Regions:
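C-terminal helix/juxtamembrane-tail motif
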Residues: 445-460
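Cytochrome P450 heme-thiolate monooxygenase catalytic core
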Residues: 71-77, 113-273
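Cytochrome P450 I-helix active-site segment
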Residues: 3-13, 120, 171-179, 229-237, ...
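Conserved cytochrome P450 K-helix E-x-x-R motif and the immediately C-terminal K′/meander segment
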Residues: 17-31, 35-37, 214, 218, ...
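Central I-helix of cytochrome P450 enzymes
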Residues: 148, 152, 212, 216-217, ...
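N-terminal membrane-proximal hinge/A-helix region immediately C-terminal to the signal-anchor transmembrane segment
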Residues: 1-82, 94, 98, 113, ...
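Cytochrome P450 heme-binding "Cys pocket" and the immediately downstream C-terminal segment
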Residues: 284-286, 392-393, 410-449
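Conserved cytochrome P450 K-helix/beta-meander segment immediately N-terminal to the heme-binding cysteine loop
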Residues: 361-388
Length: 460
């Protein structure tokens, strides 16, 4: 007999809507995972959702022979902004395959390495500011948000914009960041709101969507009006590429969808670096180890692509930050539809779910599985270094999602994060303005530390 899946009791008709704060959805879910364990369920206005919070069960539900990505809830809501893009397309929509085949050649390891120099050109905008003078008070997340946008603009669209030092461009960059953060947060809240409230919020949702679509239109306009920008890059593929299977091209509206999707997806990398600054500020010995490794491998010159393969400890810092932060906090899974309506068994028959049950992986809990990590709550890069990283179960490394619907740009995101972190450590020293700052993070499709100010100085 299967074990009942635990969960908070809830109230009649409304279910568990009071157990999840819509303004802090992921913080609420993380607390429930700690309280109820590796699998639990809630009822939201009559809809049951099951949550997965350990490595063993995540390994089971990421088996693509049995389960697939579930496009539901907030992911459906953000289709208002990006329609049937790579991130939001339903499993049976042909548009996903067309866009994926057109874009995929520009997301390979080789293509990612080819744009390394673009990243290396942009990141000094950030490190020059942060190392300009001692004890500069900076909200790190703002600068990382816009340097991420600048890096996307150069890597994918061959457009060089200074969002750090140019006040006019910085304002545009921050408006774009605010729009996609606000739109995704609105998408997160809409499924659990009464319909009349969603109508009241619709004008704001429309405004943020318009900001993003207009920003993306300017990217396209700039390419068309500036022949010097032309090259065989992601934007060229979006505008001119032909799907080898269907011979179809993307409409301009679809190009806009994918440009916005790139920005929304890439935001995880900027948020990861904000967390890295936090954890290294709290763990100065690990920061010293990373700096010593960079000095040994790189010396006084610039960091190049070949150096990254030798910066093992710095990469472990990044991995450990990714583990603890779970900055892409979860992903949706459901059983693959079949003619059978029989319940689906999990955990070797220990649990039973309906045949069409949506599930959400809570990576904050998965990544702290005490059965896998010796120090689940502590920042210890050594536990994800070298063979220890290699020997971890695959389900303990799902920060970018799973299978064919995992993060499309994960190679670029990791290269950007790795190089940017190494550059920050090489060029600056830093500490939290408030040594007693307590980590508070929030977000929708990606989360980051809020209200965190850092004192940056040049590294001697």
């Amino acid at each position: 007999m299967p074990t009942p899946i635990p969960g908070p009791p809830g109230v009649p008709l409304l279910g568990n809507i009071f157990d999840v704060n819509p303004a802090e959805t992921w913080n609420s879910l993380n607390k429930l995972a700690k309280q109820y364990g590796p699998i639990f369920k809630i009822n939201a206005l009559g809809h049951q959702i099951v949550f997965i919070g350990n490595v063993k069960l995540l390994a089971e539900i990421t088996d693509e022979k049995r389960f697939r990505k579930c496009v539901t809830g907030p992911v459906v809501e953000i289709r208002y902004t990006v329609n049937d893009s790579l991130f939001t397309a339903y499993d049976d929509e042909k548009s996903w395959g067309i866009a994926h085949r057109i874009m995929a050649p520009h997301a390979t390891k080789e293509a990612t390495e080819q744009v390394f120099n673009d990243i290396a050109e942009v990141i000094p905008d950030l490190t020059k500011k942060w190392s300009a003078s001692p004890k500069q008070r900076i909200k790190a997340s703002d600068d990382l948000d816009v340097i991420l946008i600048a890096s996307c603009m150069k890597s994918f669209f061959n457009q060089r914009v200074d969002y750090i030092a140019n006040p006019t461009e910085r304002k545009k960059g921050l408006e774009c960041v605010n729009a996609f953060q606000s739109a995704t947060m609105e998408a997160l809240k809409r499924p659990t709101r009464p319909g009349f409230l969603n109508l009241l919020y619709k004008p704001r949702f429309s405004s943020w969507t318009s900001t993003l679509r207009n920003f993306s239109k300017e990217v396209i306009k700039s390419r068309k009006n500036t022949p010097d920008q032309s090259r065989k890059d992601m934007l060229d593929a979006l505008l001119n590429g032909v799907d080898p299977e269907t011979q179809q091209k993307l409409k301009e509206s679809q190009v806009i969808d994918e440009i916005i999707t790139i920005f929304i997806g890439a935001a995880t990398a900027a948020n990861l670096l904000t967390y890295a600054v936090y954890y290294l500020s709290k763990n100065p010995e690990e920061l010293k180890k990373g700096a010593a490794e960079i000095d040994s491998v790189v010396g006084d010159g610039p960091i190049d692509l070949s150096h990254l393969n030798q910066l093992h400890y710095v990469e472990a810092i990044l991995r450990e930050t990714f583990r603890l932060s779970a900055t892409a906090p979860g992903f949706n899974i459901e059983p693959i539809p079949s003619d059978s309506k029989a319940p689906v068994l999990l955990g070797g028959g220990e649990y039973e779910i309906p045949h069409n049950q949506p599930m959400i992986a809570i990576l904050n809990a998965v990544n702290r599985d005490p059965e896998v990590f010796e120090y689940p709550e502590e920042f210890k890069p050594e536990q994800v270094l070298g063979e220890k990283w290699d020997n971890l179960p695959a389900a303990a490394k799902k920060g970018f999602g799973n299978g064919k619907r995992e993060c499309f740009g994960k190679l670029w995101a990791w290269q950007w994060s790795f190089f940017t972190l190494a550059s920050i450590i090489k060029e600056t020293t830093f500490e939290l303005e408030n040594p007693n700052y307590e980590l508070f993070a929030n977000g929708a499709f990606s989360i980051k530390p809020l209200d965190m100010f850092v004192l940056f100085s040049p590294r001697k």
